[in-house]
């Protein structure tokens, strides 16, 4: 099996490094940009970006979903912000699951309204994620970032129309199960 090294990425599907060269990856914007700089932020020419509410942020004191939504609305006016995310559900870290699910539903709504695909963060919550996907029936593409699950879970997600993005740690059988045009590579670099 020949799996490309992450260090040799031609295109990084998911990174947090703001110094990523334009056209070489999708930079996931941080909460400071979304909450405080959205109205003045300008993308690099030729850059690709994503903006969303990470499930970990739901544990922040004074978490304000409406403030995040206002910031996202401003950022999504830029065509370079081509994805909603990273957003999702994390059973190990973040606010209460009910809050995370409410935020996720709002992010799906935002994605659908803006016509942007979603980058999904999901940790030990694929049952909830699949239920949300079934209930909300999104038309926009969902890509699970940093996928580490097995081939069976990979196939379930693929059958629902989702793509998978693989980082440094992954299950080789899941990689093999995923068609080349439905799998992405990422660094998830800070």
Language model features with spans:
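Mid-domain alpha/beta scaffold segments of enzyme catalytic cores
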Residues: 1-190
